[in-house]
């Protein structure tokens, strides 16, 4: 096996007590993706021989949530980071190198890890930082020549050592040929009664192996999450970076600080996104698309020159070109809109194909339907697609005019150029060019006197 073989171990067994959550800490999300999933994806970009994830608390939840190709190893007792890596030993190559990462350090990037791996060579690589406040973190101990000799955890540090500002991020590169012996020789004789992975630095020095420190270029890249405040801080950093990338690519963000991207956005030119918009999953926006304030767009494709008015929610749908959607519109999964469609306020469309030029401007539900072109839905139109057990399909032709406050009871078919009178309940098929009325005749009662309250 070549000496440059890379194994990756991701430690994700911690409970996360300070998160005050029933969810395992590593499943809390940054940018809509669980932290541990982000770390796995970053590790995978390095093309390692394998990725080994050490889990413990909430193991079942983690395995059910994160669908990634990895070796999953359970740490039944949380006895420290050294013990966690030892748990993964049977899955690591006897030669090459092992990169140790953490499931709660979500913003570590490929560039930083490649720099660390290059610096480490076949020796030990150590990622360090000099944060504004090093409290609670392990300190880097150097000798008179500046070489790293040890890492001391804060609980075990002397008063002098606590004045050191350079800290250990926990991310290490270790030679596999030495790793097993080093791990087996670890002691838990320390303030926390745990097996510290950081003690391997002193063992490397004792064996004459050079420790190559690399300082991270930005503290947030190696920052861990221990509570909701830190989670929110990293989320905002992540979102700021996402917004800056979109701005560089030509997207207009009315306020970059009030925009969230929780997935991937593919976009054309001259796209404009107003404030408080959330993009989730896989979203594609064509040229000249405008997204109004307070919209949520999830797993959707929106064609060129379409405008999404404020407070609209689009999920799992496809919108053609030159559409006008909203305000307060909802497009649900499998809504498929052709070009030049208008969907107005308080209109909901689900699992329906809408033809070119069709309009539903207000207060309408269209579900499980196939609608032709240039059809108009009057206000208050409802497609009653559910009989309490099964969903049924409605077919509506071209240039149909549906009067206000109509109910179309599925399964039902309306031919081309059909007109329905306002207030009709349509339960039977209607042929082309027909007018259908299905409502009670109006009755006017002569001489009727409205009751009045007794004023006494």
From Swiss-Prot:
The gene is glmU. UDP-N-acetyl-alpha-D-glucosamine binds at residues 11-14, 25, 75, 80-81, 102-104, 138, 153, 168, 226, 332, 350, 365, 376. This is Bifunctional protein GlmU. GO terms for biological process: cell morphogenesis; cell wall organization; lipid A biosynthetic process; peptidoglycan biosynthetic process; regulation of cell shape; UDP-N-acetylglucosamine biosynthetic process. The keyword Magnesium applies. Its main location: cytoplasm. In the N-terminal section; belongs to the N-acetylglucosamine-1-phosphate uridyltransferase family. It holds the Pfam family NTP_transf_3.
């Amino acid at each position: 096996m070549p000496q440059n073989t890379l194994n990756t171990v991701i430690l994700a067994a911690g409970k996360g007590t300070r998160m005050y959550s029933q969810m395992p800490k590593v499943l809390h999300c940054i940018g809509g993706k669980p932290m541990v999933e982000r770390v796995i994806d970053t590790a995978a970009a390095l093309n390692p021989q394998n990725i080994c994830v050490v889990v413990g608390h909430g193991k079942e939840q983690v395995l059910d949530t994160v669908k990634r190709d990895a070796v999953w190893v359970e740490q039944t007792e949380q006895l420290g980071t050294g013990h966690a890596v030892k748990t993964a030993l049977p899955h690591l190559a006897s030669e090459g190198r092992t990169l140790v990462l953490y499931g709660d350090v979500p913003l570590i990037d490929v560039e930083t890890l490649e720099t660390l791996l290059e610096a480490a060579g076949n020796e030990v690589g150590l990622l360090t930082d000099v944060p504004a406040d090093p409290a609670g973190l392990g300190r880097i101990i150097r000798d008179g020549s500046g070489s790293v000799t040890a890492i001391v955890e804060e609980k075990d540090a002397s008063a002098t050592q606590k004045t050191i500002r350079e800290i250990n991020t926990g991310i290490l590169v270790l030679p596999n040929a030495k790793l097993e012996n080093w791990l087996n020789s670890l002691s838990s004789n320390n303030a926390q009664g745990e097996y510290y992975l950081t003690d391997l630095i002193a063992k490397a020095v004792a064996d004459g192996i050079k420790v190559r420190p690399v300082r991270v270029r930005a503290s947030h890249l190696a920052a861990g999450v221990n509570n909701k405040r830190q989670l929110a801080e990293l989320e905002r950093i992540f979102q700021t970076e996402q917004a800056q990338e979109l701005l560089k690519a030509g997207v207009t963000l009315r306020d970059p600080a009030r925009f969230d991207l929780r997935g991937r956005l593919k976009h054309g030119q001259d796209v404009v996104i107003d404030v408080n918009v959330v993009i989730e999953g896989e979203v594609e926006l064509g040229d000249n698309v405008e997204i109004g304030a307070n919209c949520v767009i999830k797993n959707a494709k929106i064609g060129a020159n379409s405008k999404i008015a404020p407070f609209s929610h689009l999920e799992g749908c496809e919108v053609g070109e030159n559409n006008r959607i909203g305000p307060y519109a909802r497009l649900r999964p499998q809504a498929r809109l052709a070009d030049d469609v208008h969907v107005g306020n308080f209109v909901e469309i689900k699992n329906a194909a809408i033809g070119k030029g069709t309009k539903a401007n207000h207060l309408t539900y269209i579900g499980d339907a196939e609608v032709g072109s240039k059809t108009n839905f009057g206000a208050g139109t409802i497609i009653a697609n559910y009989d309490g057990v099964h969903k049924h399909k409605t077919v509506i032709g071209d240039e149909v005019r549906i009067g206000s406050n109509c109910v179309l009871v599925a399964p039902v078919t309306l031919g081309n150029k059909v007109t329905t009178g306002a207030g009709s309940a349509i339960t039977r098929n209607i042929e082309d060019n027909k007018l259908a009325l299905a409502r009670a005749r109006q009755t006017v009662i002569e001489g009727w006197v409205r009751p009045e309250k007794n004023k006494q």
